[in-house]
Amino acid sequence: MAYALRYHPEVAEEDLPDIPVNLRQRLARSIEARLTTRPEHYGTPLRGSLKGYWKLRVGDYRVVFKLAGTEVRVLAILHRKTVYEAVTRRLG
């Protein structure tokens, strides 16, 4: 089953510009290869206040996403030290 990707507006505006180009390409390849095919296999479910969300580890970066039917909603692509705080803020 193929999954469609949808990105939170802040991913393009805030997250991606701060990531070096070579890492951006690596992240794009991982997201495209893993999250569009088997996100529940490659991702790890989050716990606590972020229960219902998943993470994909790509080096020191984390891609936080939510599964909604055949859609993968990407909330953040940030360094592991700041990603969970940013996701909590984006969720309001």
Model regions and ranges:
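Generic leucine side-chain signal with a strong bias for well-ordered alpha-helical environments
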Residues: L27, L35, L46, L75-L78
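Arg/Lys-rich, positively charged N-terminal/basic patches that mediate binding to nucleic acids
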Residues: M1-R29
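A short, surface-exposed loop/turn module that caps and links secondary-structure elements
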Residues: E32-R57, E85
